[in-house]
Curated annotation (Swiss-Prot):
Chief place of localization: nucleus
Gene Ontology cellular component annotations, sorted alphabetically: chromosome, telomeric repeat region; shelterin complex; telomerase holoenzyme complex; telomere cap complex
Coiled-coil regions listed in the entry: none
Cellular compartment(s): Chromosome, Telomere; Nucleus
Name of encoding gene: tpz1
UniProtKB keywords: Chromosome, DNA-binding, Nucleus, Telomere
Annotated source species: Schizosaccharomyces pombe (strain 972 / ATCC 24843)
Record's keyword annotation contains Mitochondrion: no
One BP term from GO: protein localization to chromosome, telomeric region
Chain positions covered by the region annotation pot1-binding: 2-223
Protein name: Protection of telomeres protein tpz1
Region annotation (ccq1/poz1-binding) ranges: 379-508
Complex formation: Interacts with ccq1, pot1 and poz1.
Job description of the protein: Telomeric DNA-binding protein that is required to protect the 3'-end telomeric overhang and involved in telomere length regulation. recruits poz1 and ccq1 to telomeres, regulating telomere length negatively and positively respectively.
Length: 508
């Protein structure tokens, strides 16, 4: 069994583990053998010294590890002095003291190997190692150990305060609250919290329920008040409508809510019967023209329609004059006379203005493969809706295109005879392509196929002639080789060619 402790590992193993520590305690799983050197405490928790024949460290056995040992053997753990155990899971603790940091381990699982009796080697305390002692003097490890021990003390005091509060719920809990507020929790000791520490006291629950009820009732009251205020504002902002007494035969139009002044707004004191008859007639855009009607007749239709905008206005600017009207025929006749006078004056002005702005369209057909006569059709757009037909003048063109390529106009059109009314007008030319007359698509397809067939046959003849000449030359060479009694074939031809190349190189 002494061979199990042949290689001491305690110093180097603990150095590497503690050097890279960032939290306490350090949890380790390492199957390494150690010997129970000496017992320090025989009662629970049982403490002893474990050595690797060179150094020893204080250890504490957990209750779970002791129960596992009792299931394995009937021996008590305190009777195993000098026995060899193999560690499984264990925790490394660092305790700050006046002399420095003291390390110890807490064994959670181990396997008993046997060999109770003598102690191997002369082990010393792990703190006597120069390397290990230098590591324990690190301020980082000191701060880490102080923080861990302070958190343990604060957690224990908080547990005592919570237990006393549960035993006396009716007493004043101000002292326990002060203790709770002064405690500084760290993330490392959050695992030590119990369920009782997370429960909210009954007094605090009542306070929270009252605050939530007050907030909800206050919020509902504010919403109802806002809705009532909004309804009151909407009712107060509605404009007041004026009620005016009017006659039975007249329709009154009131603009009491308008921002315009009374002098700028026209009134309509016309007779109701006249307005009803005017409304029965269809508007101009709803009376379609017949096919036989001319543009002159359309102007007559427009002149006969009653337009309210053309009614005579009062010189004072108060709208339509309130003169008496006997019948609708008299009203229509007066309106048509005024309408005709205004149309005549506007027509004379428009003719003078549009004389320089008239434009004529000339449509010219483009030339194709055949020679044919072209005709020029001119149309003049008049602003009043009248159409002027220009004289059609035949134009004879020469040979514009010698081939069937894409036609391009390369000459200017000849002089055109227009009437005296449009002699000074601007001329706009529009060229349109005229389709080719009497063109047979199938005939064109047959000619194209015939040309392709002729070209294919010529290529075929040339290829056959080339093959015949080549074969004749090869046959003549083979016959000559046979006549001379020389070997012939592809291999011998290649050999002969290489010999010719070699002779040529030697000569050069």
């Amino acid at each position: 069994m002494s061979n199990c402790l042949k290689h001491p590992w305690l110093e180097n193993g603990l150095l590497n583990l503690i050097k890279n520590a960032d939290v306490l305690p350090i949890r380790v799983f390492k199957c390494q053998p150690l010997q129970i050197f000496e017992y320090i405490r025989y009662e629970h928790p049982i403490r002893c010294k474990l050595s690797d024949t060179e150094f020893y460290i204080e250890a504490e056995f957990s209750s779970q590890s002791i129960s596992d040992l009792n299931n394995f053997t009937e021996k008590r753990i305190t009777s195993l002095r000098g026995g060899i155990v193999t560690l499984g899971n264990f925790l490394i603790h660092l305790i700050p003291s006046q002399s420095g940091i003291i390390p110890w381990i807490q064994v959670e699982s181990f396997n008993f190997q046997g060999c109770e009796g003598a102690v191997f080697g002369n082990p010393k305390a792990i703190t006597t190692s120069a390397l290990f002692n230098a590591l324990l003097q690190s301020p980082y490890l000191a701060a880490l150990a102080n923080e861990f021990n302070r958190s343990i003390k604060e957690g224990s005091s908080y547990q005592e305060a919570s237990l006393s509060q549960q035993e006396k719920p009716n007493d004043n809990t101000s002292n326990s609250r002060d203790i709770k507020n002064n405690i500084q929790f760290h993330w490392k000791n959050m695992t030590s919290l119990s369920i009782e520490e997370c429960i909210i006291p009954k007094g605090q629950q009542l306070i929270l329920e009252k605050e939530s009820e007050e907030n909800t009732t206050h919020g509902i009251y504010l919403e109802e008040r806002k809705m009532a205020q909004g309804l009151h504002n909407s009712v107060s902002e509605t404009p007041e409508v004026k009620q005016e007494d009017n006659d039975e035969d007249l329709d009154a139009y009131s603009w009491s809510s308008s921002t315009d002044s009374a002098g700028e707004i026209p009134s309509l004191p016309t007779n109701r019967k006249i307005l009803e008859k005017i409304a029965e007639k269809p508007p101009p855009f709803e009376s379609p023209l017949e096919d036989d009607e001319t543009p002159d007749q359309t102007n007559e239709h427009e002149a006969n329609q009653v337009n309210v905008s053309q009614l005579p206005l009062n010189p004072r600017g108060s709208g339509i004059s309130g003169r008496p009207v006997e019948s609708t025929e008299q009203l229509n006749s007066s309106l048509t006379i005024e309408r005709s006078q205004s149309i005549q004056s506007t027509d004379s002005k428009q003719r003078v203005e549009t004389q320089s702005h008239r434009r004529s369209k000339i449509e010219i057909f483009d030339a194709q493969d055949e020679l044919f006569d072209r005709s020029i059709c001119t149309t003049i757009d008049d602003s009043t809706g009248k159409l002027l037909n220009a004289e059609e003048t035949p134009i004879k063109t020469g040979d514009l295109h010698s081939t069937s390529a894409s036609s391009v106009i390369s000459c200017t059109p000849p002089a055109i005879n227009f009437t005296s009314d449009i002699c000074n007008e601007q001329i706009e030319l529009e060229y349109k392509r005229k389709p080719i007359p009497d063109y047979d698509f199938m005939k064109g397809l047959e000619t194209t196929l015939q040309e392709l067939y002729v070209e294919h046959q010529s290529k075929k003849r040339r290829l056959e002639l080339f093959q015949l000449t080549n074969n004749h030359q090869k046959n003549s060479e083979a016959c000559e080789m046979c006549r001379l009694g020389l070997p012939h074939g592809s291999f011998f031809e290649l050999l002969r060619d290489w010999k010719k190349i070699e002779e040529f190189r030697n000569k050069s």
